[in-house]
């Protein structure tokens, strides 16, 4: 509501994305257009999904995507084609034998195995998803990180320097913070 435009919401899994989509679609279907990424999308389906961001619209488009998936990296939606990314979770990979071997390898060398096996790959997915919003120096957009772990020093140290001007707020203050951001952007222009 703070700013109409195109947004992507990135989830750590298809299951969580589907669960949130069902709730969101039931509550917001009348106030915005909603898209959802599907597993095994064919090329023409991917193209049709991205073409939705090229359309001129009066309202808001909200696209549900999987972090680290086909829309989380390698797509260029410049200018006002994408004005916001909402990132749910820290992108940590699932625990697996491969991840445990990697973690143990770095732990045995006196390094943080958790960082190398989990935190760094997860943050790479987060940064890739966030990077869909700002593609040129003229682009402006909002990036919402929805996970309290982002407040930890270990995660904050991995943020790009451009993120130094950031706000931390709870859900009750979110609308006000996002409105303030867009008001500041309009004043810049």
Feature map (PLM): residue ranges:
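ASCE RecA-like P-loop NTPase motor cores
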Residues: 1-189
């Amino acid at each position: 509501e703070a700013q109409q435009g195109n947004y992507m919401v990135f989830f750590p899994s298809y299951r969580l994305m589907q669960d949130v989509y069902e709730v969101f679609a039931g509550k917001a279907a009348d106030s915005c257009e909603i898209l959802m990424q599907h597993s095994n999308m064919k090329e023409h389906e991917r193209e049709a999904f991205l073409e939705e961001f090229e359309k001129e619209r009066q309202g808001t488009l909200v696209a549900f995507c999987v972090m680290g998936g086909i829309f989380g990296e390698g797509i260029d939606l410049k200018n006002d084609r994408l004005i916001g990314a909402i990132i749910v979770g820290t992108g940590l990979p699932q625990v697996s034998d491969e991840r445990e071997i990697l973690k143990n390898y770095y732990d045995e060398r006196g390094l943080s195995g958790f960082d190398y096996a989990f935190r760094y790959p997860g943050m790479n997915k987060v940064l890739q998803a966030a990077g869909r919003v700002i593609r040129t120096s003229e682009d402006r957009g909002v990036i919402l990180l929805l996970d309290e772990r982002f407040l930890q020093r270990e995660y904050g140290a991995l943020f790009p320097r451009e993120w130094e001007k950031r706000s931390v707020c709870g859900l009750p203050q979110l609308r006000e913070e996002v409105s303030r951001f867009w008001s500041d952007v309009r004043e810049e222009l």
